[in-house]
From Swiss-Prot, chains A, B, C, D, E, F:
Subunit structure: Homohexamer.
Major place of residence: cytoplasm
Family recorded in the similarity comment: Belongs to the bacterial CoaD family.
Name of the protein described by the UniProt record: Phosphopantetheine adenylyltransferase
Domain of life: Bacteria
Entries under HAMAP family matching the protein: PPAT_bact (MF_00151)
Function: Reversibly transfers an adenylyl group from ATP to 4'-phosphopantetheine, yielding dephospho-CoA (dPCoA) and pyrophosphate.
UniProt keywords, alphabetically: ATP-binding, Coenzyme A biosynthesis, Cytoplasm, Magnesium, Nucleotide-binding, Nucleotidyltransferase, Transferase
Matches recorded under Pfam families: CTP_transf_like (PF01467)
GO biological process, one term: coenzyme A biosynthetic process
Lineage of the organism: Bacteria, Bacillati, Bacillota, Bacilli, Lactobacillales
Name of the encoding gene: coaD
Single GO term (MF): ATP binding
Pathway: Cofactor biosynthesis; coenzyme A biosynthesis; CoA from (R)-pantothenate: step 4/5
Cellular compartment(s): Cytoplasm
Amino acid sequence: MTKALYVGSFDPITNGHLDIIKRAAKIFDELTVVVAINTNKSALFTPQERVNLITQVTRDLENVACKSVTGLTAETFTQEKADVLVRGVRNGEDLNFEIQVAGMNQYLNQEVETVFIPANSKWEFTSSSLIKEVVKMGGSIKGLVPETVEVLLKSRLK
Amino acid sequence: MTKALYVGSFDPITNGHLDIIKRAAKIFDELTVVVAINTNKSALFTPQERVNLITQVTRDLENVACKSVTGLTAETFTQEKADVLVRGVRNGEDLNFEIQVAGMNQYLNQEVETVFIPANSKWEFTSSSLIKEVVKMGGSIKGLVPETVEVLLKSRLK
Amino acid sequence: MTKALYVGSFDPITNGHLDIIKRAAKIFDELTVVVAINTNKSALFTPQERVNLITQVTRDLENVACKSVTGLTAETFTQEKADVLVRGVRNGEDLNFEIQVAGMNQYLNQEVETVFIPANSKWEFTSSSLIKEVVKMGGSIKGLVPETVEVLLKSRLK
Amino acid sequence: MTKALYVGSFDPITNGHLDIIKRAAKIFDELTVVVAINTNKSALFTPQERVNLITQVTRDLENVACKSVTGLTAETFTQEKADVLVRGVRNGEDLNFEIQVAGMNQYLNQEVETVFIPANSKWEFTSSSLIKEVVKMGGSIKGLVPETVEVLLKSRLK
Amino acid sequence: MTKALYVGSFDPITNGHLDIIKRAAKIFDELTVVVAINTNKSALFTPQERVNLITQVTRDLENVACKSVTGLTAETFTQEKADVLVRGVRNGEDLNFEIQVAGMNQYLNQEVETVFIPANSKWEFTSSSLIKEVVKMGGSIKGLVPETVEVLLKSRLK
Amino acid sequence: MTKALYVGSFDPITNGHLDIIKRAAKIFDELTVVVAINTNKSALFTPQERVNLITQVTRDLENVACKSVTGLTAETFTQEKADVLVRGVRNGEDLNFEIQVAGMNQYLNQEVETVFIPANSKWEFTSSSLIKEVVKMGGSIKGLVPETVEVLLKSRLK
């Protein structure tokens, strides 16, 4: 029985994130999507809004749960009795950043292992920040985020 | 007849930008340099100042025009009846960022094609931000930007 | 009037190459695909076979011609009265190699300019060498190369 | 129940490989190490020798099996009823190569998913080829490969 | 007689920085660690606090001195009669940034030469910013920074 | 007193190598250029020819010596009583390879330290292999290698 955690800010969830969730849910027996609350960064959606959106768009995935957590991922890993952290990577630059975070997590908690799932090349250009910028400039993000997220983003950034 | 757009913030134009402009003007029949106005970012020079500087330093290049635009590059591409977007790249990191932006532009407007011109290695270390930082610290940027830009930068950052 | 050259070994042409050809043909007024004959490397198909395959799969693209050439690209550039060289790039590693080749070409012939077209992420994992390896191991490459190429490859590598 | 495959040439297995095996065996319920036989490449050890070495150095890992296979990994994936392919990555360059191979594997067999485990920085500089080169030049590789491998390598490359 | 400068913000010094200092002190006859004061950036520790910390943790290294400087590194290089600048690099991304800074320093002062020391892989995941973030979230950074720094960090970020 | 070694195949020396030699000779008190003889690789020039060429083009650099060596660099480091190994790097890819070699050298001999000198962007596109290829195809390499090397290369590759 293998339990994975997918930790991120998901502000908001994009179809790129959703693709990683679906593929991780297929690989691992259990997947918990964790909205990491970072009090040092301003966010567009509250933690609860983000959890609601993720829960809604993953409702068909039986082995996927979602929660929000403050504090260190290395501690959440133990609290959640996880076996592995999952992260998506698009290119060498993502990898350099993720190797640093994975190294720090394993330093803080020797049990923590991280695996990287290569992003589907279809979503290679998506990121929450670029999508929010396009919405602010009046662009259509249809197909880049789940519909419920699209509606909420437009109203929030009108 | 091939029309290219070179879109950026140009805050201000550097000799690295100017090198890309001259080479793109040689490759393509028509080149329009577009100062992209981003209301979410503070700039040192107003859009009009940036357009004036670019117009002045490219006055000898007959097939080069310059304007400032708010809004999405993907829309400007259609409004300007362009055939291609041009961007300069210095290294793998620039490329990762540019591939993401090019992917989003093509998603928003299927007609958009982007080509990358390899930066002349002579200007590999220049960027508007690093040049502004050097001026703030009293360094000489002679030869890194056109003279008119150098004079204006010094007075603005005195 | 802008004439581009797309120089490569094309041993054989893949759908990744064909995607670059179609997009370059859309950007530039004229495109010549040049099969570069490298006497130091063994090839699976003869130069003429490669030219025939390319000519056949680009027959609907009116502004695209194809020929094979021995000798330096920097010299072919002048002989063909080209304005620009076109190359596809998938990631930072491709870029490092291409920047080196572009730098040497411009050193040998100052007129040579090179632009890079970002590979369509759909074809990011294709390359002639990986496709040939898959065929040798009995895998199906349907959809990765034009059909005529698929048939010829299978018979050649049976 | 999650079954992973770790496919490679392992010519021979190094402590870097062994580290990935141990960590994958901890993450997944079952791990099969597959020695991929590539008839196009010359190898130092026979497939059976490589399987024997791997089997011996992983004997304490109950959920780890080892076998050699010719043919496509995408087919082995189905034959072995695997859930995921596992590969180690050290840097951006490894990732670019692995993303290409993972993309081809998923093209050949849609069920194939690949995850990358970041190499332990301790083994970042090891590779079978560099280790063989050091042995050929009389260097000591103590600690870089399991002892049995060290003994066999020295005798084979004397 | 070779004198090196190691210039950075060191806000605060980490064991990764200390590793570079020890190795540079072994390579070069003289090493001056320079705390670069950047009035445009907010810092956690004052320049004097940073100098005190560095002086304390390098007290056993006879050929190492420390000072803080405002102004351009290219000018400090001449004032300090240095022969070379030393910087640590962990991966390709660090290198791209460092090549840009080294290029600008050499443009501002032709005498400036920069050499890069590969970070010890043990400290590959450490950086002042990530360490401060972990402390803010209540994590233990024991072993990542010298003890005196650990104590001061905890009190400062309580 | 700091003694550096610059180890490579130099088959043949290029102006890119020479630039690294001149800059290393300026930084360090003593520099020995070591032609590493690799019996597993075919070379265009004999070790002695390479040493003669290097000796000739560095005759004005008083603190530079040259020799050829078989065997491990880690052992040569001790025999030559060196303080540091010097290597040139052009981009992230070079760095990944050099970090691996530096890691292995330090593993084989804990005393070995390696520093990287950023290649002058002017020579970023040069490499012995690319230069030999251009000569084979009849191209002019004037200015890319010292004149004596140019003459010898042309006659050898006629």
